[in-house]
Amino acid sequence: ISHARGKQFLYDEGTHIPLVIKGPGAPKGKKRNDLIEHIDIAALSLAAAGIQIPQKMEGQDILSSKHQPKKFIFAARDRCGEAADQIRSVRSKDFLYIKNFFPERPHLMPSNYKDSKLIIKRLRDLHAEKKTNTLTNKLLFSPIRPREELYLYNHDQWQTKNLAENKKYEKTLTELRKNLAHWIVQTGDPGPETLDVYILETEDQMSSTGNKVSRENYRKNSELYKKWFKDGK
């Protein structure tokens, strides 16, 4: 869960995974700053095992002499448990662009999984006691989120200064927005599930939740999300 903006979100805190490679064919003592994605690990593993990479695979063998570093990498988040969301992002060497498809929903939406964690409980308690600072209130407890977020890595390591409305970066924002839109079409991104599918999935998950308190929290949360679906929120 990290500090509430990590797991299940598309900031670096939730997506950046250090990669260390050791073995035959791996150069020793070399550091690289390439942009790579999880899907590249499958291609890399096949190549390391001497298996031909299928042409239909999007992943790349990053140790190949023919490897061309990517200009952009992409990430996505949808429903996690009963917490229905739709977030997409694209990252370049210098910038991170995030699009929230449900900006009317709060950042820390109700989640039986997350709300059971001590860090989230403590943060919610501190906020209720008015002991959280302005930045925390803005990033975690705002009732709505920006539709678009843009962050400059070298000057904003933790992605707290949204530049999406800064005219200075309008060209960058437009470029990344177009690249994300192209990726969504190219990959056939289906978007969020329908309300009917949400109901079927969450009812199945709720029935397998053993703890009575957790099951009741899950039920209350899913009822709220169903209302949001119907309200177009």
Name each region found by the language model.
Residues P24-G25, N33-Q68, H155, K168:
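Non-catalytic, well-ordered alpha-helical segments in soluble enzyme domains
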Residues I1-K30, D34-E37, K56-E58, A76, ...:
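Histidine-centered active-site microenvironments of extracellular/periplasmic hydrolases
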Residues H16, K131-E148, H155-K233:
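Long, internal low-complexity/basic segments
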Residues I1, E104-R105, Q159:
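Acidic catalytic loop of the alpha/beta-hydrolase fold
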Residues K31-H38, R88, L140-P143, Y169:
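Aromatic-acidic/polar surface patches that form glycan- and anion
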Residues A49-E149, N221:
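C-terminal cap/loop subdomain of S1 sulfatases and analogous C-terminal strand-loop tails that border
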